[in-house]
């Protein structure tokens, strides 16, 4: 018996042809082949298996899927996404970077009392060159401040309809009340009082509030303030130096402020004051540095790095 081996094995024994087929799946990867047939029952040839260990289509390299039948590898010198490609970068970006601005600080704050025009002008100059000018008409102010709590026309005064003069810091008003009697009013008007009253009405960024503790000192813009007339007990550090505060026995007033906090260091400074409340403060109404004790302090976030701080304190000296 003579045999011819090719893609199939055909053995001739007399007139009987025995065809021996290889297994469908073998180590030689005959299952999927790029086969051709001669059409005459001749031998079957094969060139490249579609899936084999030699197939470069599925490899660790990047192949050119649109190349010729040789599956030539494309160069991987410039991979589509690499560490040098900015498409995928582990670098945070600020989507609002073009519009980011630094909050300006207050350079100067001046208050001018114009007696002839019966008004006060407050001007704040910021570090970016902008100015914030506010004007308070004293007539309108005293109509509101003096007559608060009184019904219109009942023992009340309409300063816009009465003549008054300002002499040596005193407003002198002579008017006729609804009962027909004349009455003279003297209202002391010094610059500190005007600043104080002005800031209570036009509080938005109207003045600076300064706090210092040890060697640290910060300034804040005042968003609002309220001077509460009810008495509160003042405190002083205990004699033995502990952080306990003893009652002095004298009555003091509580000052309430809402401050604008424009940086994280300022916010952190205020946070630690909750456990270390003895400070020195300076603001318009007191006119000098005073020792104070914080009664309460709370922070509310506006946006990143910007906060409002509500603070209550009493002056100790």
Swiss-Prot record:
Residues 68-87 are annotated as: Disordered. Residues 68-78 have a biased composition (Low complexity). It comes from the Archaea. This is Uncharacterized protein MJ0345. It comes from Methanocaldococcus jannaschii (strain ATCC 43067 / DSM 2661 / JAL-1 / JCM 10045 / NBRC 100440) (Methanococcus jannaschii).
């Amino acid at each position: 018996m003579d045999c011819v081996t090719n893609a199939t094995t055909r053995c001739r024994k007399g007139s009987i042809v025995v065809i021996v087929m290889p297994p469908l799946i073998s180590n030689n990867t005959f299952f999927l082949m790029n086969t051709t047939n001669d059409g005459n029952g001749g031998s079957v040839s094969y060139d490249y298996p579609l899936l084999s260990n030699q197939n470069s289509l599925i490899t660790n390299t990047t192949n050119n899927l649109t190349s010729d039948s040789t599956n030539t590898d494309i160069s991987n010198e410039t991979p589509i996404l690499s560490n040098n490609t900015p498409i995928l970068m582990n670098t945070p970006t600020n989507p609002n970077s073009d519009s980011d601005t630094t909050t300006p600080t207050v350079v100067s704050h001046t208050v001018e009392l114009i007696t002839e025009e019966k008004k006060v002008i407050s001007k704040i100059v910021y570090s970016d060159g902008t100015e914030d000018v506010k004007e308070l008409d004293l007539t309108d102010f005293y109509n509101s401040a003096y007559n608060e709590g009184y019904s219109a026309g009942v023992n009340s005064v309409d300063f816009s309809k009465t003549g008054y003069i300002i002499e040596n810091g005193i407003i002198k008003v002579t008017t006729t009340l609804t009962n027909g009697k004349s009455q003279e009013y003297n209202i002391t008007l010094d610059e500190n009082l005007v600043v104080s009253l002005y800031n209570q009405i036009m509080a938005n960024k109207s003045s600076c509030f300064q706090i210092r503790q040890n060697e640290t000192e910060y300034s804040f813009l005042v968003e609002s303030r309220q001077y509460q007339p009810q008495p509160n007990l003042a405190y002083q550090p205990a004699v033995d130096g502990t952080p306990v505060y003893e009652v002095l026995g004298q009555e003091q007033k509580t000052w309430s402020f809402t401050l604008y906090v424009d940086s994280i260091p300022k916010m952190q400074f205020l946070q630690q004051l909750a456990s270390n409340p003895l400070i020195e403060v300076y603001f318009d109404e007191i006119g000098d540095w005073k020792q104070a004790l914080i009664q309460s302090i709370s922070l509310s976030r506006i946006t990143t790095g910007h906060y409002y701080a509500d603070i209550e304190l009493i002056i100790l000296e």
